[in-house]
Amino acid sequence: MMENFKHTTVLLDEAVNGLNIRPDGIYIDGTFGRGGHSRLILSQLGEEGRLLAIDRDPQAIAVAQAISDPRFSIIHGPFSALADYVAERELTGKIDGILLDLGVSSPQLDDAERGFSFMRDGPLDMRMDPTRGQSAAEWLQTAEEADIAWVLKTFGEERFAKRIARAIVERNREQPMTRTKELAEVVAAATPVKDKFKHPATRTFQAVRIWVNSELEEIEQALKSSLSVLAPGGRLSIISFHSLEDRIVKRFMREQSRGPQVPAGLPMTEAQLKKLGGRELRALGKLMPGEKEVAENPRARSSVLRIAERTNA
């Protein structure tokens, strides 16, 4: 039985407003979660509107399946494959907006059995979809020390990555870790300098989670796919929660807003320039949560919403 863990949707109104909803439009919520954004989108759609929601978490799928609305459909899978889902429905180039709320959700963090949190002891899993792929425990038991260190440094920006990786490998040789508490204790013991404002396992848990779920690759693929999926004037509305996610989104929107970069002085005909194409997106700026939202939901503090619009190029 699935427990009802509370989830407060971050930047709810702002993210949906960023889609510039048309009553008869077709929209994608690529991260259904507990349905906060989807329900608000549906409330703004008319009878002809459609909403396609995606999530790879079986618990989110169970929540979505309880929505009995003919305008709504749910897909169990990664949002990186959104171009395939759209093509299967013959909607390529017809999508009016895509919303992505990146990272781990509050219900996933709060449910000890999911293994995302160092604050609650549970199985060392961390998979967004527990039915697919390697768990965190399985990966840490089989990975090379150098690979673990690279993951901690790259995806957790952990300055003690090598020390922690060595401690993880040594501990797994003695007794394989299967619990979140075990990993948190190993990391804490291997960290020589503690940050009084942050648990020593914070960066390690973030890095392992990102690696196990291929989160950054998922984001990059979804962003690339959005260009073929969106109709001219269609919107991208994306919420990020840490610098690694936001960096990818920011870079993508900036590059697609600039168009092809041709070196100065390179001789090109008008036909060649036209073939290169123009700007794919128009960046519409970013928003951050206000003081009131952060006070009511501290997890919103690090969130950033970026919005862009598909051009006619």
UniProtKB/Swiss-Prot annotation:
It is an enzyme of class 2 (transferase). It is found in: Cytoplasm. One of its GO terms (biological process) is rRNA base methylation. It catalyses: cytidine(1402) in 16S rRNA + S-adenosyl-L-methionine = N(4)-methylcytidine(1402) in 16S rRNA + S-adenosyl-L-homocysteine + H(+). Specifically methylates the N4 position of cytidine in position 1402 (C1402) of 16S rRNA. HAMAP family: 16SrRNA_methyltr_H. Its EC number is 2.1.1.199. This is Ribosomal RNA small subunit methyltransferase H. GO terms for molecular function: rRNA (cytosine-N4-)-methyltransferase activity. S-adenosyl-L-methionine binds at G35, G36, H37, D55, F79, D101, Q108. The keyword Methyltransferase applies. GO terms for cellular component: cytoplasm. Belongs to the methyltransferase superfamily. RsmH family. The keyword Methyltransferase applies. It comes from the Bacteria. Its main location: cytoplasm.
